[in-house]
């Protein structure tokens, strides 16, 4: 968590309007392949000094610790190989990609749609 809390804070809450939360939110991204890829491609993850294995382990821990209720029923943990293949192509515009992914997911996930409405 040391590598994430500088922006997302120790309790994974983020900064409203500036840094998105991990807590009770990040698990939604795993409901689509684009969202899953995004979590590894964001610059803070893809450009981290952590190894591929460490990133996979950290992401799996973060998701299961801070956003378990939002994970898909058939959650598949990140693997070292998956992280290695995704982090070579960092997301150039994380804010735009995040908005697009969440808007697409909101059509399928009523709970996410309600959260997005309440937070906008």
Question: Where do the language-model regions lie?
Answer:
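Mature extracytoplasmic domains of secretory-pathway proteins
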Residues: 49-59
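Flexible coil segments in periplasmic/lumen-exposed cytochrome c-class electron-transfer proteins
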Residues: 53, 64-120
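Gly/Gly-Pro-rich "capping" loops immediately C-terminal to redox-active cysteine motifs
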Residues: 13-48
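The canonical Cys-X-X-Cys-His
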Residues: 1-10, 58, 62
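Stable alpha-helical elements in mature extracytoplasmic
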Residues: 31-38, 54-55, 79-82
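A short, ordered amphipathic alpha-helix with a cationic face
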Residues: 7-9, 28, 70-72
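Structured segments of extracytoplasmic/periplasmic soluble domains
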Residues: 10, 25, 38-45, 61-65, ...
């Amino acid at each position: 968590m040391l590598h994430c809390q500088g922006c997302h804070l120790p309790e994974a809450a983020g900064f409203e309007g500036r840094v998105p939360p991990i807590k009770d939110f990040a698990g939604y991204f795993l409901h689509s392949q684009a969202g899953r890829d995004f979590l590894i491609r964001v610059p803070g993850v893809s450009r981290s000094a952590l190894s591929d294995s460490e990133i996979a382990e950290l992401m799996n821990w973060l998701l299961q610790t801070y956003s378990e209720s939002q994970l898909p029923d058939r959650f598949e943990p990140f693997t070292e190989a998956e992280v290695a293949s995704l982090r070579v192509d960092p997301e150039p515009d994380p804010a735009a990609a995040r908005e697009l992914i969440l808007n697409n997911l909101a059509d399928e996930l009523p709970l996410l749609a309600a959260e997005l409405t309440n937070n906008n």
